Amino acid sequence: MAMTEQQKFKVLADQIKISNQLDAEILNSGELTRIDVSNKNRTWEFHITLPQFLAHEDYLLFINAIEQEFKDIANVTCRFTVTNGTNQDEHAIKYFGHCIDQTALSPKVKGQLKQKKLIMSGKVLKVMVSNDIERNHFDKACNGSLIKAFRNCGFDIDKIIFETNDNDQEQNLASLEAHIQEEDEQSARLATEKLEKMKAEKAKQQDNNESAVDKCQIGKPIQIENIKPIESIIEEEFKVAIEGVIFDINLKELKSGRHIVEIKVTDYTDSLVLKMFTRKNKDDLEHFKALSVGKWVRAQGRIEEDTFIRDLVMMMSDIEEIKKATKKDKAEEKRVEFHLHTAMSQMDGIPNIGAYVKQAADWGHPAIAVTDHNVVQAFPDAHAAAEKHGIKMIYGMEGMLVDDGVPIAYKPQDVVLKDATYVVFDVETTGLSNQYDKIIELAAVKVHNGEIIDKFERFSNPHERLSETIINLTHITDDMLVDAPEIEEVLTEFKEWVGDAIFVAHNASFDMGFIDTGYERLGFGPSTNGVIDTLELSRTINTEYGKHGLNFLAKKYGVELTQHHRAIYDTEATAYIFIKMVQQMKELGVLNHNEINKKLSNEDAYKRARPSHVTLIVQNQQGLKNLFKIVSASLVKYFYRTPRIPRSLLDEYREGLLVGTACDEGELFTAVMQKDQSQVEKIAKYYDFIEIQPPALYQDLIDRELIRDTETLHEIYQRLIHAGDTAGIPVIATGNAHYLFEHDGIARKILIASQPGNPLNRSTLPEAHFRTTDEMLNEFHFLGEEKAHEIVVKNTNELADRIERVVPIKDELYTPRMEGANEEIRELSYTNARKLYGEDLPQIVIDRLEKELKSIIGNGFAVIYLISQRLVKKSLDDGYLVGSRGSVGSSFVATMTEITEVNPLPPHYICPNCKTSEFFNDGSVGSGFDLPDKTCETCGAPLIKEGQDIPFETFLGFKGDKVPDIDLNFSGEYQPNAHNYTKVLFGEDKVFRAGTIGTVAEKTAFGYVKGYLNDQGIHKRGAEIDRLVKGCTGVKRTTGQHPGGIIVVPDYMDIYDFTPIQYPADDQNSAWMTTHFDFHSIHDNVLKLDILGHDDPTMIRMLQDLSGIDPKTIPVDDKEVMQIFSTPESLGVTEDEILCKTGTFGVPEFGTGFVRQMLEDTKPTTFSELVQISGLSHGTDVWLGNAQELIKTGICDLSSVIGCRDDIMVYLMYAGLEPSMAFKIMESVRKGKGLTEEMIETMKENEVPDWYLDSCLKIKYMFPKAHAAAYVLMAVRIAYFKVHHPLYYYASYFTIRASDFDLITMIKDKTSIRNTVKDMYSRYMDLGKKEKDVLTVLEIMNEMAHRGYRMQPISLEKSQAFEFIIEGDTLIPPFISVPGLGENVAKRIVEARDDGPFLSKEDLNKKAGLSQKIIEYLDELGSLPNLPDKAQLSIFDM
């Protein structure tokens, strides 16, 4: 007998093991009506009819269970039909998020959409959106797919409407708000339950109960024999097992309360995304939480195409954490690494120093060095890492050593240049080493009296086959050399032919190296002839040239070079060039060979020298300071393409340093290739240790034929070791590490490939991973076991033992000294307090001053206050207001010393005449500016209203010992003056810009990775690209400077006690030098002044200049001004006209779309509420999903939600908590650390409501109230001009804050402008950044036009270069507002106009340099009326 559809449903429920989870009515009445099967696509679609909706949690459980059950057979989907759709609207709200996830929207847009409210009306679902832009975007993007998703869940929906919130929908919203409130109450209950659960778990742990999950294990054990490499996964499969290390993990909570985990793993063959839903009534979540980046897992599941990321992913059924054998250093006695590069080696090293230090400590190494290229920026982190891991840190650097003066002439002869005979010669060889390679061609010409008088050209037989590289370079073949004479014969003949002539060669050190080596092997000894190097000569006398190669010089001197890299042709070209150079030397007064070096030497000689790598190791604290001086000089004084260290500089500051020979680019390695052993040993004596590096690192030298073969390389090692033994200098094996493990090398390849001019940008890079002792011993096994142990282990440890403990960073603050600072700050504070509050100060004022002064003076901070006071005073004296940032406004002393305008005392009245005051200490008033107007009961004068109620603790900490960070907003145009004033206060050598280090950002790294893969023709899935991006992210790319940070060095120390110095981004033309260390590294050691540039003070200054109104006299509580934050009525326009419900376009802090929406939601009416808005808009998780919902559901209003960090401390103290606990809670919440059990208990004991606790738990970051108050004060002042002096406001706004103009639209009528704005709103999601900036300007222009003002076209006669000017009821734009017209051209137009009128467009082009495109734009704008294309001459002009 066939089963009924109900029986089929029961069987299905049993099979997928959810019968016990379903409601009885559903289980008994549910029907499985049919299954649509597609064998081709391997899909099954179950059609199910239910009597009522499944609870959302049960629905997700059902879907997940059925997918898991049949995952090995088919991809399963379900379509539900619900016969009784009662409460469809209620269920729609709960299913909304799931249905959104079924669409193809981006994660960001999905997140935005999930925040929206729903209203069900029959078969129509309304989604309430914020504005027309959202409505149009969502309607186009997801309407159809969202309807389909709802219908698949069983909803009877005909239409989805995206609708903006209008007043007639309020009654529909009421029921929804009740529902949300119910959910909020439920959330509060869940939070309480969660707390109780935490308590219980903590108690269990204290009882040593080890039941907590510390290792992930979900599903069945996975058989290791089933594991396959990730790179082998190329298509959908039913059951696959892999293992890999986690490099990214994301655990997301769904609305149902369940979670989904997304893990990215790699086995270093490739990478893959793994996904899994938590199962109901299982402890999957705890298992997932046990996972973290760096752990290895084994996973099994179905490989399927993820439609969203468009890539293969694994839907896991099983996952288990595994222990993976890590790389070990098994040697009994460990080595010490003396040469490694971190992420601070610009675009070359990969890991941060902390990773190296941890690895060295794990391997048991006793010490480790850091030697980045040319910089020491890893030192601060190195110190911290070494302290953490208990390992000795050795500080060093790999620098670029140059000889101070590279000679142009060698072996000076007393010979008059014009009378001398010269032999200009060139050699072609089998390679670059005169010790290991051979001459194959020697060609020369003899020159006398400016003419070539003889030639010499010979091949020589090397008795070995030429490499393909040499054949291609020289065009000499083996056949050409078969019958050639021996080199001994050629050189003997050549020596006789040369006689006593002066040798001339281009890059003479190379050619003479082969000649001298050949002479010595023949027993002649080195040549005694004079030499001139045309390469160095050109670099000296042709400083304007950027190149000095033979090809380039031949073109410059007009000399024909027919076949470069054939000796005779190169020689003849060099000869003709040299003849002209002799004339140049004569003009420079150089007449004799022995005068060349003396008369042509200059202070830039270091630029001509070829740099050799050198390793500098700090031996003691004195050496550290000397290294700082060397680094600074190399970056500031001797920078040429790269930082350079003249040998004289190293000699001057060598004390406390150990000097090593570095790598194959070092002077000693080059000498082994180019000089005999006696010369090598002589050079070796300059160094304190000799480095040899693994043969694997030199394999590319063999590949590039710079070293003949492995046997030659081994001989080079032996010569280096012999040089060390002979000179008594230790020889150590160093790894030249650039990354940790072999598999990290790909990241370095990608970074190098991103630099086209980098000499390392070759097809292969050597393996430069951090090697264990075993690996290093194995690399040098060819030396024999004893010798290998000596250089790898014994010598490195002995060298490390010679190095003292060095501390690169100070452990305390060193502030400048200013005589009498303590007394001056105290006197200034009380003097200004008495001016404001009277001679008989209120006790609250005295108490606050004394409390702050005790901390400020007691901790040595008075000088910091005094410096800030001087800077502010100078700016005020020069006519520019200064705005404060950060929490300095929390300090009443800062207020009384006029550092900030924010008064942090509780709200109060003050009589300006008789000085009586009245304070409100009960928290009933948020801001003194919100107090009602009142007259003095004693004298009748209008009272001053002040006080923002901000505790001092938010500035200097509860104990008052936190170093003050005083941030000041100066006018952008005045900022350079403020910076330079610090030089007046402290001296030029005591102030520096705070340095920053710019690293490779994720987006940039993504471009590098994609570019590399494309160039290599490699395809990788997204997860592997993400891994490679992570590998490249964070590597140093450049340096910079803090926008306003000034570092002040105390007069009793110098900058090298703290950090080296440099120019930002190595820009030698920069006006300021910066700290070499990132300023965060020395933040607690030296004073940093934040002298920032800001538009608001500049705008205030322009408004003051235009109006004559002192901004300090502007009333903060002007009713019409306050009105614009909730309606545009006081501007004389309607919401429809300006397309906005507020009047805050262009008002700082309140003009963005995000904040305008906040204003619409909250409708603030007081200053304190505006401060709340400012705090809410700058915080993280303070408004969205937090205060916004509390206000919408009526739980509290704007004034009572948590807006700024200080609100928490003040609120809790008023609630009865001890100030210390209130402070602790505030600090914990503002840093996103939530609340501890103790904090929650204390708050509940003092009857703090649950919603307040819940709000605290959600917050990730909070804005200081003093910062918000200062910003709002500036905003209200600017808003005052907008309301009462509109043209002054619009002229100032367009001049100071706007940058992208569409003048064609701006000069039109108000209807046209409004239509343009409306059209741009409809296309907002598709607009680029520039268009959005233009839209911001047009919004202001539309408002201005609807207020009755208009914009004129550019006027050749009246327009200024940079400022908008007022004419009647109009503004005239400046030339700079023309798109594509730069500052210099704008100035030039005004200058040219002052010399006389423009006669034609041609005249305009000639005098002002305007392009044809700009002239056409001005013509279209109507700015060139009656201006002819060309001037017409009249008879009277002739």
Curated annotation (Swiss-Prot):
Keyword annotations from UniProtKB, A to Z: Cytoplasm, DNA replication, DNA-directed DNA polymerase, Exonuclease, Hydrolase, Nuclease, Nucleotidyltransferase, Transferase
Primary location class: cytoplasm
Domain Exonuclease: 422-578
Stored InterPro entries: DNA_pol3_alpha_NTPase_dom, DNA_pol3_finger, DNA_PolC-like_N_II, DNA_PolC-type_N_I, DnaE2/DnaE/PolC, DNAPol_HHH, DnaQ, Exonuclease_RNaseT/DNA_pol3
GO cellular component, one term: cytoplasm
Pfam family, one: DNA_pol3_a_NII
Keyword S-adenosyl-L-methionine attached: no
Gene Ontology biological process terms, A to Z: DNA-templated DNA replication
EC number of this enzyme: 2.7.7.7
Top EC class for this record: transferase
Keyword Nuclease: yes
Domain of life: Bacteria
Function: Required for replicative DNA synthesis. This DNA polymerase also exhibits 3' to 5' exonuclease activity.
HAMAP family to which the protein is assigned, alphabetical: DNApol_PolC
Protein name per UniProt: DNA polymerase III PolC-type
Organism, scientific name: Staphylococcus aureus (strain Mu3 / ATCC 700698)
Lineage: Bacteria, Bacillati, Bacillota, Bacilli, Bacillales
